[in-house]
């Protein structure tokens, strides 16, 4: 079983953030890829359609820029594993190609004081014509 396709989330300040499970231990406990404090309430989640949500996000960014010429992307490796599990890797790669994404797989991203998993972080470069 791959935990990449079944993330749990924690609610912080009204927003939900993934806390990805690394593996199940022999004693029944779980090891996470990022910090989970004692007593934190975790909620089972269901991921959005990876391809559709990526396409929608890139379209929103491209529209705001007047077109995206290039995206430097940092894509959590767990998203790649999830795409493989759901047989969406090729379709997701097509979206990345359509929006000029180049970059790296990562082991999560830093957002403020939080280490996040199963996220895509990027820098989009484009330009509006005047």
Predicted regions located by residue number:
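Small-residue-enriched flexible segments
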Residues: 1-99, 106-130
